Structures are given as structure tokens and as C-alpha cells.
């Protein structure tokens, strides 16, 4: 077959295949509209941002949703935040209410966005939450044990700024010349299951033989927590927030000599390339059940509409399969009970339309979309329109 004819045939077949997949999903209830009876699954599609569109989905497993998340759109910039809380929702909720505002304030003061500004926004958020802990821990000691992972992406002037604490993850789907999609992980997982993280902790704490402990087949810091970086978790950062023996799960047998967790984010900068098709931002509940490559292939091979929801459901189906169950069985379970089968999961898929990235789109709606909240509000990122 002539090369030009082969390319046309391939493109036509790709469209037919995608249509068939969509029809199949509509018929078997696995598409975005076929699971209205899963009351713990929320989604929002498709919303414009300055350089394309995004799809957003959250499923609740815990009795109280510990994942908080947001997308802020403006004519000049787009902000994506995924905050996977643990021990409670206070830290993830606090981040959702303050981090983007700190970033906008600092960017306006400096007249730009940079790695330092992102780092300082994280620092201000950590300081603010620790101040809250200091004011309330005598009344509610457990707040010292509450923390959150924090994954943030900012798209501004053709560049993606990424910052990460914990094991939420950002992955890019890159198109090859043969129209194949390849996953590239952009963030590092700060989790004690990773050998490099254990080595880092041991080098920072050479006098502490219990800095990482293998407990019931899982590596944990001080035998308690898996993530090595977070907002909050004050009891593992400052001795003043040590918890007494009555809270056995979080009690340390010896006084804290130095912080064992840090709030210093890993920061990455990526100039967007023409082959960067989309980005997936997700809490670890997704990555527990799907590989990076599986996730990008699902996005690449299906319509944009409902794609974040589709990813969440793919993870839930895999979680069900591991327990020799079906997704239909899991979605009938109540919140709290579902946590025995899967975690809270947040997914934001951000599509990049490179024509918009180059030319800009001043008509982009400036809105704030929050996970599991149906109504949108004004975006704080409208304040970035004037910076150069």
C-alpha cells in the first residue's frame, strides 16, 4: 500500500475504532453516562482552559472524603491541584483553600511565575497549617496527625511548572511519529516503598535504626507512614506536637530529635513540546491499580468527553478484579466500607491544544472547579492576567 494511502486508512480506522468503543461503553454502562447509580463518583466535563480542555473526576471511598482538588482557569494561566489527605480531611481542605491564593499573591508581587515562587507558596501553606495545628491541638490533639500529599501543576507561557509532595503523580502522554502514545512520569513518588526514598531517609538519619521499618510487608517511616513528604503531619516534624501513648497508632517511643518528614517539594519545569498530547494528574488511588502506560492508552484510545471518569472506573474495575468481584458490586457499597477495596481517587486529565498554546485565547472562562462540588466560582487565577 502507498504510504499516503496507508496514513489515510489508518486515520479512518482509528475513528471507526473510537466510535465502536464509545457505542460499546454506552451499551454496557461503562461510559461516562452509564453509572449514574454510583453516587460516590463525581465528574465534570469538558471544561476549557487557556491551552485546551480538561476532564475531572473524583470517587469517594472514605467515610469523609480526604481528597480535595481544584482546577483554576484564567486567560493567562491554568492551575491544577490534587491534595490526597490522610488521617482526616483538614490538611487537604486547608491546602485547597490557601495554596493557589499564596501562589497568585507571590506571582503578583514578583511579576512572574518561577520555581522559587511555587516553592514559597508551598512553604507559606505549610506554615499556615502548622499555625492552625498550634492553635487547636490542645483541644483536638489528633489534628497533629493529619496531613496531605500535594501535587500542583501550573501552565503559563508554554511552560508547565510541577511541584509534588507525597505519592500523587503527574504523567504526560507523548505522541510518537507513528501515532503511538508513550507515558512519561514527570514526578517522583515520595514513598518509602521506593528504594531511593529509603536510602535518602537513612542518609538523613544515620543514628536512627527505626527510620524505615518493614511492617506487614509494607515499608513505613517510623513504622507509621508511607509518604516521606507532606503538608501537615506535625507530630513527625516538631516535638511540641508529639502525641501521647493513648494515640497508639501515632505515638513515637522516643522523642523526636529532628523532623522525619519534610514539606520541601520536588519541583520540575517542562517547556511544552508539540508531542505533549495530555497530562494526567492523579492521587495514588489511581496508580495503585493502573500503570502509567495503561492510563495514557486509555486516554489516547477514547473520546475526551468523560475520560477522567473512565480512568477512575478502570481503576475501580481492577480493584474489584483483585478481590474477585465486579465493579457493579463495589459501587453498591457505602462510603467507609468501600475503603476496604479502594482509596479515594482524584483524576484530572488536561488536554493541550498547541494552536491555543501558541496564540492564546482571551475568551477562556475564568472559573474555579472544585472536586465533588457541582457549582463553579470565580477563579483566583484571573489575577495573573497582568503579569509578564
UniProtKB/Swiss-Prot annotation:
Q: Copy out the cofactor comment.
A: Binds 2 magnesium or manganese ions per subunit.
Molecular-function GO term, any one: metal ion binding
EC number(s) recorded for this UniProt protein: 3.1.3.16
Q: Where does Mn(2+) 1 bind?
A: 84-85
State where Mn(2+) 2 binds: 84, 284, 343
Which processes are annotated in GO (biological process)?
Answer: regulation of intracellular signal transduction
Say which family it is in: Belongs to the PP2C family.
The identity of this protein, by name, is Probable protein phosphatase 2C 43
Which organism does this record belong to?
Answer: Oryza sativa subsp. japonica
